[in-house]
Amino acid sequence: MSLLRKKNVDQMIAGAQRAGLKKALGAVDLTFLGIGAIIGTGIFVLTGTGAVQAGPALMVSFIVAAIACGLSALAYAEFASTIPVAGSIYTYSYAALGELVAWIIGWDLMLEYSLAASAVSVGWSGYAQSLLKGFGVVLPTVLTAAPNSVPGVTTYFDLPAFVVMMAITTLLSVGIRESTRVNNLMVFIKVAVVLLVIAVGVFHVTPANWTPFMPHGWSGVFGAAAVMFFAFIGFDAVSSAAEEVKNPKRDLPIGIIASLGVCAVLYVTVAAVATGIVPSSQYAGITHPISYALQVAGQNWVAGFIDLGAVLGMLTVILVMTYGQTRITYAMSRDGLLPAVLSRVHPRFQTPFLATWIIGLLCALIAALIPLNVLAELINIGTLAAFSMVSIAVIVLRRTRPDLPRAFRCPGVPVVPVLAVAACVFLMLNLSAVTWKAFGIWLVIGLVIYFVYSRRNAKIAQGGAQH
């Protein structure tokens, strides 16, 4: 049995066309879907972490992270327009690079989606607590954060993060999916909050706070960029909607690139305002840096709106990431790479009920017990590895299937995909040794599962659907 057996691209596309899903999404819907998935903990919470690490040069860190993401986004856009099939990077790699690589990427995606849902839950917790304090409700300190996450403060369990994660799991398990209209409304709220920060904050910027601009040198800038990469994760969620798009070959690339571009501009501007209002070193240990900056500026009413907007806006990110995790698990189980029980559908709710609850409970415990900075780095290394693979896959599919119609072509192949791989690997090298060790352990576990179970049980081995 070949480790590189592939799914047939033509059969995949034909199967997607027979699926009968309602094709209702356009370019604007996809752009909003992307922005909805991107804007979350990265900007509302990790801005403080990045500011401590890079200083005012956090603006440069965002640009570096955006370039790395943008190069990968071009590769994503080509795949999304060529193979408009649900499943995103896992499906693309199964067609272009073969089963073993698809397994590794799927295993990486499971890490990305589950930890991203947990990380956003932690971010949500910080803003929810800040909002509750405005109404005089204060939780016991030991239940406000994961152990060792707040310097000098004894904490054991992040209760709000656990509760919100379980609430989202309950909704998903009974089949409540966010509609495009609700998602667009939440995106509007999040973008409005970010614009409010910029509009009010710009009048309270003290240029002296931008000096020194790069207090920790380029190592601080690149280290922060490796963490802030998390702020852009989510544009890949656009491609998972491929089978429900009216004109996927045109609209998917627009949705991917437009959502990333809008968020990059907003992030750099917010970083400039936040580090201009508060000296970057003062963000250490702050779990709600954006509203904190406005509180320092004396704009408590604006800070309250930011807390509310962040709480509402991050709910959609938790939902999208948790749903994405259940979808990738379901797809891999359906392909035979994971046990069939994980793709079993509830007879009443028509959802992968057991898989949703297993994933939800694990994510809730992770959110309650692991500090945010640790989660962010682990998410980033898995995602950067997966993005590198999709860039390589573009080059491979160009050579192996030059006949496939490509509505969008990644420019400068193979140079641009090679640059994307180089940028992703460079950011990976700026992550901590502990993160690399944890990622290595995760990969080893995944490979053991593949060789012991998945390789023998893969549906493709039974059906011989190779190209």
How would you label these PLM feature ranges?
Residues 44, 108-123, 227, 232, ...:
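Membrane-helix boundary/coupling elements in multi-pass transport proteins
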